[in-house]
Amino acid sequence: MGMRMMFTVFLLVVLAITVVSFPLDRESDGANAEARTHDHEKHALDRNGCCRNPACESHRCG
């Protein structure tokens, strides 16, 4: 196997990895699944009517 053939195989492998990983990045939106919260969870109130999010401006307790 010559150097030119090895380089061509290397380029094909890099291209294949790029093509396969691109759709996976789009599905994850580039965000950590654990860090992602839904809008209804961000400003959800607990039993006492307090907002659980520290950045919440309304219904703050404590």
From Swiss-Prot:
<dbReference type="GO" id="GO:0035792">
    <property type="term" value="C:host cell postsynaptic membrane"/>
</dbReference>
<keyword id="KW-0027">Amidation</keyword>
<feature type="signal peptide">
    <location>
        <begin position="1"/>
        <end position="21"/>
    </location>
</feature>
<dbReference type="InterPro" id="IPR009958">
    <property type="entry name" value="Conotoxin_a-typ"/>
</dbReference>
<dbReference type="GO" id="GO:0030550">
    <property type="term" value="F:acetylcholine receptor inhibitor activity"/>
</dbReference>
<comment type="function">
    <text>Alpha-conotoxins act on postsynaptic membranes, they bind to the nicotinic acetylcholine receptors (nAChR) and thus inhibit them.</text>
</comment>
<feature type="propeptide">
    <location>
        <begin position="22"/>
        <end position="48"/>
    </location>
</feature>
<keyword id="KW-1015">Disulfide bond</keyword>
<dbReference type="GO" id="GO:0005576">
    <property type="term" value="C:extracellular region"/>
</dbReference>
<keyword id="KW-0964">Secreted</keyword>
<keyword id="KW-0732">Signal</keyword>
<dbReference type="GO" id="GO:0090729">
    <property type="term" value="F:toxin activity"/>
</dbReference>
<dbReference type="Pfam" id="PF07365">
    <property type="entry name" value="Toxin_8"/>
</dbReference>
<keyword id="KW-0528">Neurotoxin</keyword>
<feature type="disulfide bond">
    <location>
        <begin position="50"/>
        <end position="56"/>
    </location>
</feature>
<keyword id="KW-0629">Postsynaptic neurotoxin</keyword>
<dbReference type="GO" id="GO:0099106">
    <property type="term" value="F:ion channel regulator activity"/>
</dbReference>
<keyword id="KW-0008">Acetylcholine receptor inhibiting toxin</keyword>
<keyword id="KW-0872">Ion channel impairing toxin</keyword>
<feature type="modified residue" description="Cysteine amide">
    <location>
        <position position="61"/>
    </location>
</feature>
<keyword id="KW-0800">Toxin</keyword>
<comment type="similarity">
    <text>Belongs to the conotoxin A superfamily.</text>
</comment>
<protein>
    <recommendedName>
        <fullName>Alpha-conotoxin-like S1.1</fullName>
    </recommendedName>
</protein>
<feature type="disulfide bond">
    <location>
        <begin position="51"/>
        <end position="61"/>
    </location>
</feature>
